[in-house]
Each structure stands twice: as structure tokens, then as C-alpha cells.
UniProtKB/Swiss-Prot annotation:
It holds the Pfam family AAA_22. CDD domains: AAA, Cdc6_C, HLD_clamp_RarA. This is ORC1-type DNA replication protein 1. The keyword Acyltransferase does not apply. Involved in regulation of DNA replication. Keywords: ATP-binding, DNA replication, Nucleotide-binding. It comes from Sulfolobus acidocaldarius (strain ATCC 33909 / DSM 639 / JCM 8929 / NBRC 15157 / NCIMB 11770). Belongs to the CDC6/cdc18 family. GO terms for molecular function: ATP binding; ATP hydrolysis activity. GO terms for biological process: DNA replication.
Length: 397
């Protein structure tokens, strides 16, 4: 067994592709962002009041995945903070990862030096502590909420409303919010007051074209790859493939990185067009199939309950999903889980992009979730039937 390890390590030592592969990862912010000069300029102009200790407008930033929204925002804010360290506090939160109002407020408080328990307090109490903390000193707090479409889909827009109105309760400090979203249509579903407050200023990020992606890859390959390991033709191929996928720079960088990893694994010192095509297949491997196949049993049963329920409905509520789930558990002779746990599973399926669970307000009936599939029904059925014999047996009954 150690011979296998030695052989792999020996091959990897021969590969001299990367100078620093970390510079191809999404969280790396380069010193220059090609073809985003207009967006950088506009964001700096909007935020300029902080240099005079004045509150800037709230900003809504739109654009598809991989169009540079997060990179530009962090680039501008980190540069402003370096130039004006005492003028403002910058807090960045990805709301897909910190996906509850409680966690968001807890992270904001912790960034301001206030520790809070992981659970146990109400959001109202957290807001109260937030206001109290801000009223103890004088600053501008810029809160960047990335991927807010994920937050709004799960929990509605109440936290956005409260954050954009919090300045009415502040005497010395002020708060501005930068909202970043991949889903332009999400804005249509916001409370008009939230839409008005958060969208005081807007910046649109268009997709990159193939030539622009090529420039980005050339810039990044110079610092991330060793000299001479990739040709201009191979860079053009990576750019062209990513341009087909709505001009996604993240996709282009992933293609470059995985192509390099393939060449390096095989002990070569040159990335070829074949490596790029193999990387494309590797990246496009059916993510949905793999995610569903590895779900726990009850998560699969909840998912199949949603599929069956949507045969006769365009959307489902959590209660309707739970009713179907109970019947299926009975048919299979397994002990059912609680409705609360089913609700948690629905949130988890939404988080990984298998379903969409949108919070809607039904007036006097309160808030509920409207659940629908975000992927092909056929893929769901195929992956569950092939990965779980017990649930697969439902189709033979």
C-alpha cells in the first residue's frame, strides 16, 4: 500500500504546473480586476461619503454567478479601509453559509466585539444589543450581505427591513447595507419598503465575454502558474468554454485550475487542450446526481415525497410534504421523524439547490413555505432508485 502512495507522490513531484494554486481559488482577490473598472468606479463614488464620516447610500448589486460582484465589493472596501482605517467598519457575511437572521446578527455583533451564544436569544434581543453597541461609539458600519437571495428565499425579508431602518434608533453611529444577489427577479418579491430602502443605489454586473475572460485568465495564470506551462490557445479554450456558461469567470478559473491539476497528477509540465476537456467533464459531472445519491435515508424520503406531491400541485407547503412523507414511511414500515425535522431537511435540500423553499406571507394565516423542485424530476427519481433499494421499491408496489 505504501508503494502506491510513494508512486503518486513521486509523480506529483515531477509536475511543475503551479506556482501558487491558491491564486486560482474564488476567495482570492487580485490587485487588479480587468473589465470591472466601471463597476469599481461607481461603487467608490457611492461609498465616498464615508471618507467624510458620512453615511453612504445602501446599494443593491446584481449579476449572475461569476460576474465579479463579490470580488469588486471586497476589493473596493478593503482598499477604502486601508486608506481610511478610522472612518468605517466593514462586515462581510455570506448569507448562504450563515443562513438565519440569528446567525447574521450574531456575526455582526461578534465583528463589533460582542459575543453571543450560538442559540437561545431572540432576534429582537440581538437587534437591541446591536443598537446599544453602536450607540457606545461613533462610526459608519458597512454590512455586506452576499447571496441575499438565499436568505430571502428561506426566511423572508424582515431582517433586511430592520437593518435598513436601524438608523432611526442610532444616535452616534450609522449603518449602510450592501446587498449582493445572483437572482435579479428576487427583488420583485421584496416588500416595497425594503426594495426602496435597500435599492437607493444599484450596480449591474453584466456577464463577461470570451475576450474578457481570456484577459482574466492571462492575468491570473502569470501569478498562479509557472512560466511556459500553458499556451495562449489553451487559455482561449478555457475562456471560450466559460463564455458559453453565461460568462462565468469563476468557471473559467476552475477550468484552468483543474486542467493544471490533471497535468500535474500525471507528472507533466504542460497543460493541453485535452486536459481542459477532461476538466470540463470532471466539473460538469452530474452534481445533482451525486448530491442526491449521498443523502441520508429520511432526506431521500422527504425529497421523494416532494416529487410525488408535485405531480398534482405546482407548489407544496411543509405540512403537505409531511403528510405524504408519513404515508410513505408507513408503506416502507420505517419509523417516521417529526415534522420539525422534516422542515429542517427541507431547508437543507433548499440550501444545496435541489429544491426551492420560498417563505411567503399569507396575511392572517401567517408565513409558510412554498416548496418546488429546482432540478429535473427524472434525475431525482433516477438517483434515488439507483442509490436506495428500499425507497426504490415504492415503484414496484
Amino acid at each position: 500500500m505504501s508503494d502506491i502512495i510513494d508512486s503518486i507522490l513521486s509523480t506529483l513531484k515531477k509536475g511543475r504546473i503551479f506556482r501558487s494554486r491558491d491564486l486560482l481559488l474564488p476567495d482570492y482577490i487580485p490587485e487588479a480586476l480587468p473589465h470591472r473598472e466601471d463597476q469599481i468606479r461607481k461603487l467608490v463614488e457611492i461609498l465616498a461619503p464615508i471618507t467624510r464620516s458620512e453615511k453612504p447610500s445602501n446599494v443593491f448589486i446584481y449579476g449572475l454567478t461569476g460576474t465579479g460582484k463579490t470580488a469588486v465589493t471586497r476589493f473596493v472596501l478593503s482598499n477604502l479601509q486601508r486608506k481610511f482605517p478610522s472612518k468605517f467598519t466593514f462586515i462581510y457575511i455570506n448569507t448562504r453559509q450563515n443562513d438565519t437572521p440569528y446567525r447574521i446578527l450574531a456575526d455582526v455583533l461578534e465583528a463589533l466585539g460582542i459575543r453571543v451564544p450560538f442559540t437561545g436569544l431572540s432576534t429582537a434581543e440581538l437587534f437591541k444589543r446591536f443598537v446599544k453597541r453602536l450607540n457606545t461609539f461613533q462610526t459608519i458600519v458597512l454590512i455586506t450581505l452576499d447571496e441575499i437571495d438565499a436568505l430571502v428565499k428561506k426566511h423572508g425579508d424582515d431582517i433586511l427591513y430592520r437593518l435598513t431602518r436601524i438608523n432611526y434608533d442610532l444616535s452616534t453611529s450609522k449603518v449602510s447595507v450592501i446587498g449582493i444577489t445572483n437572482d435579479v427577479k428576487m427583488v420583485e418579491n421584496l416588500d416595497p419598503r425594503v426594495k426602496s430602502s435597500l435599492g437607493e443605489e444599484e450596480i449591474i454586473f453584466p456577464p463577461y465575454n470570451a475576450e474578457q475572460l481570456e484577459d482574466i485568465l492571462k492575468q491570473r495564470s502569470k501569478i498562479a502558474l509557472n512560466e511556459g506551462v500553458i499556451s495562449e490557445e489553451v487559455i482561449k479554450l478555457c475562456a471560450a468554454l466559460a463564455a458559453r456558461d453565461h460568462g462565468d469567470a469563476r468557471r473559467a478559473l476552475d477550468l484552468l485550475r483543474v486542467s493544471g491539476e490533471i497535468a500535474e497528477r500525471e507528472g507533466r509540465d504542460l497543460i493541453t487542450a485535452d486536459d481542459v476537456n477532461r476538466a470540463r467533464i470532471e466539473l460538469e459531472r452530474d452534481r445533482v446526481y451525486e448530491v442526491i445519491s449521498t443523502l441520508p435515508f429520511h432526506s431521500k424520503l422527504v425529497l421523494i415525497s416532494i416529487v410525488l406531491g408535485l405531480n398534482s400541485n405546482s407548489t407544496l407547503t411543509t405540512g403537505e410534504v409531511y403528510d405524504i412523507y408519513i404515508k410513505l414511511a408507513g408503506k416502507l414500515g420505517v419509523e417516521s421523524i417529526t415534522q420539525r425535522r422534516v422542515s429542517d431537511i427541507i431547508n437543507e435540500l433548499d440550501m444545496v439547490g435541489i429544491i426551492t423553499a420560498r417563505v411567503v406571507n399569507r396575511g392572517r394565516y401567517g408565513k409558510t413555505k412554498e416548496i418546488s423542485l429546482a432540478v429535473s424530476k427524472d434525475i431525482v427519481i433516477k438517483s434515488i432508485k439507483e442509490s436506495d433499494e428500499r425507497i426504490g421499491s415504492l415503484w414496484s408496489r
